[in-house]
């Protein structure tokens, strides 16, 4: 497995599509802070600080930026074997298809955690640059932990999309577009029960994120249902 992971990592290092994830997650805190500057004064948060920025980034990453990035990168890793006609060479080693797909998924999972850490760093730099207040060790640890854990749970939710669209030649771009719509659809689940079951919102609930302010949920979420919602995607 280690040799497979190492070979997949070498492929990823030669892949410019990784820049999609880096740019997307760098844009997230900028977009979230920028939205505070362009909205009308009555809708603006007068107490916008580091805590609010971290929450915004957790929401933005899970709703838009991570689903697009992870499905695109993971789908490309699987798709390239058929596109570049290298699958027949791999099969002669021999390496079973499930083992190869498992190595690719494991790499994307590790990448999700690294992208989460990267997002924490970019969020910190953004907040310091624009002069936000309220940065304490507790705020940084809580916000940073939520960002990284949400990146991992979002990856778990995106696994079926990566597998399905990665094995359909040239379809990983379509899969990333579908991931965007599925992530954005969190806004439409106002019931706490429905939000807990819907995989993308369940990914946030599992890390202790308050959905009421962002999705307008009318009842409290249920962590046990969130485990089921994410578990269904993992066991797909």
Ranges and model annotations:
Residues 1-25, 170:
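Aromatic- and glycine-rich beta-strand/loop motifs that create alpha-glucan
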Residues 5-12, 100-101, 144, 148:
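Hydrophobic alpha-helical elements at and bordering transmembrane segments
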Residues 20-26, 169-187:
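Pore- or pathway-lining transmembrane helices of multi-pass membrane proteins that form conduits
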Residues 26-69, 102-167, 172, 219-225:
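Secretory targeting signals
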Residues 34-54, 176-236:
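Terminal transmembrane helical anchor/hairpin motif
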Residues 68-82, 87, 158-173, 230-236:
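Transmembrane alpha-helical segments in integral membrane proteins
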Residues 77-109:
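Helix-loop-helix units of permease transmembrane domains in multi-pass membrane transporters
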Residues 78, 87, 122, 126, ...:
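Hydrophobic alpha-helical interface/terminus motif in multipass membrane transporters
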């Amino acid at each position: 497995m280690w040799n497979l992971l190492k070979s997949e990592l070498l492929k990823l290092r030669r892949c410019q599509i990784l820049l999609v994830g880096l740019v997307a997650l760098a844009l997230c805190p900028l977009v979230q802070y920028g939205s505070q500057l362009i909205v009308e004064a009555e809708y603006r948060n007068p107490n916008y600080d580091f805590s609010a920025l971290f929450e915004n980034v957790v929401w933005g990453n899970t709703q838009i930026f991570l689903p697009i990035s992870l499905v695109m990168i993971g789908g490309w890793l699987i798709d390239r074997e058929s596109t570049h006609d290298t699958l027949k060479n791999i099969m002669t080693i021999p390496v079973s298809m499930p083992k190869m797909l498992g190595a690719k998924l494991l790499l994307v999972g590790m990448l999700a955690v690294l992208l989460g850490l990267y997002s924490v760093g970019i969020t910190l730099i953004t907040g310091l640059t624009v002069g936000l207040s309220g940065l304490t060790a507790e705020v940084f640890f809580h916000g940073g932990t939520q960002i990284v854990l949400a990146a991992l749970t979002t990856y778990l939710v995106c696994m079926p999309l990566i597998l399905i669209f990665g094995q359909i030649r040239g379809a990983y771009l379509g899969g990333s577009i579908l991931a965007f719509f599925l992530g954005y659809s969190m806004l439409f689940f106002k019931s706490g029960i429905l939000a807990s079951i819907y995989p993308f919102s369940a990914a946030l609930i599992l890390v202790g994120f308050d959905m009421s302010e962002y999705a307008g949920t009318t009842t409290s979420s249920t962590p046990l249902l969130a485990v089921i919602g994410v578990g269904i995607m993992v066991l797909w």
